[in-house]
């Protein structure tokens, strides 16, 4: 039997519970050790208990008191940006080599988008999964960056209001800041901007993302091929990720440049990418692709890290 590394998930809300179910069903190098929350009445903790997973409603302090804490190699943090800072400090003092996968916008460690830079971060002890909008759109920015220098990238993430729990709503400002920084840091844009829209439509619509990229002039066929290749790579761990329609291109001539705040007047090739992300519906409804892409990316990251650790 293949050895598996034990994980704890901190946060028993939508994301934490969905991630638990993914690990229970599909974990190859990982297995559940504990689900941690702060609300003893949460559905996530009740579900974990029914599935035979150890639980605590006393936060990371309760996790540290569980009999199996010594066997935990990975901790996924699905709380909030502020809570992650405290959780990281507490857990790191107890287990310096613990691997933390941060699903909040705290970004203590380097940003990680699996198809873009996972291999460079395999030995990090804390990686940040950016945001749902970042996981969906940064691969597209990086795909253009492989072909041409990207001056500016702007993303708009539209998610169903019903899929946005209290953690998501509390982190709106951090969402835009973290996503914008990651568009630059790993997407390759000189300047990035992120916008999130909570769509109140009923019945809820699946996650939709729009990516606008202004780059140096480039061969359109090469850009389109790079985008299609990247989308296929993301589908390797998020099957519901897809290009909604063909990529659109617009030439921005020198005579009529765009005025980008912070960069000035720029010309080049404008690339518009339209995406949708349908969730796998493990715990959350299919419209909650925004949450599914976060849990799927986090699981893909930890699985690859665990594989590397087990093969060392």
UniProtKB/Swiss-Prot annotation:
This is Acetaldehyde dehydrogenase 4. It holds the Pfam family AcetDehyd-dimer. Coiled coil: none annotated. NAD(+) binds at residues 12-15, 163-171, 290. Keywords: Aromatic hydrocarbons catabolism, NAD, Oxidoreductase. Its EC number is 1.2.1.10. It catalyses: acetaldehyde + NAD(+) + CoA = acetyl-CoA + NADH + H(+). It comes from the Bacteria. Transmembrane segments: none annotated. One of its GO terms (molecular function) is NAD binding. The active site is at residue 132. The keyword NAD applies. Belongs to the acetaldehyde dehydrogenase family. It is an enzyme of class 1 (oxidoreductase). One of its GO terms (biological process) is catabolic process. InterPro entries: Acetaldehyde_dehydrogenase, Acetylaldehyde_DH_C, NAD(P)-bd_dom_sf, Semialdehyde_DH_NAD-bd. The lineage of its organism: Bacteria, Pseudomonadati, Pseudomonadota, Gammaproteobacteria, Pseudomonadales.
């Amino acid at each position: 039997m293949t050895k598996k590394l034990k994980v704890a998930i901190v946060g028993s809300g939508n994301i934490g519970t969905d991630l638990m179910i993914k690990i229970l069903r599909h974990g190859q190098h990982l297995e559940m050790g504990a689900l941690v929350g702060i609300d003893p009445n949460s559905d996530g903790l009740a579900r974990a208990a029914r599935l035979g997973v150890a639980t605590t409603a006393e936060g990371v302090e309760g996790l540290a008191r569980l009999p199996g804490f010594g066997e935990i190699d990975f901790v996924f943090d699905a709380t909030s940006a502020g809570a992650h800072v405290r959780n990281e400090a507490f857990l790191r003092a107890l287990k310096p080599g613990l691997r933390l996968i941060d699903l909040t916008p705290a970004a203590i460690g380097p940003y990680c988008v699996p198809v873009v830079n996972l291999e460079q971060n395999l030995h990090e002890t804390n990686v940040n999964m950016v945001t749902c909008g970042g996981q969906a759109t940064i691969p597209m920015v990086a795909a253009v960056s492989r072909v041409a220098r990207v001056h500016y990238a702007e993303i708009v993430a539209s998610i169903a209001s019903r899929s946005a729990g209290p953690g998501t709503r509390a982190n709106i400002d951090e969402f835009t800041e973290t996503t914008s920084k990651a568009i630059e840091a790993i997407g390759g844009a000189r300047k990035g901007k992120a916008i999130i829209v909570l769509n109140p439509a009923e019945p809820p619509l699946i996650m939709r993302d729009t990516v606008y990229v202004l780059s140096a002039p480039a061969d359109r066929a090469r850009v389109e091929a790079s985008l299609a290749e990247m989308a296929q790579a993301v589908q390797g761990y998020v099957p519901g990720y897809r290009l909604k329609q063909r990529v659109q291109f617009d030439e921005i001539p020198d005579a009529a440049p765009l005025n980008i705040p912070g960069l000035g007047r720029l010309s080049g090739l404008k690339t518009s990418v339209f995406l949708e992300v349908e969730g796998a519906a493990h715990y959350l409804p299919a419209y909650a692709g925004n949450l599914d892409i976060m849990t799927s990316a986090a699981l893909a990251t930890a699985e690859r890290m665990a594989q590397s650790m087990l093969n060392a």
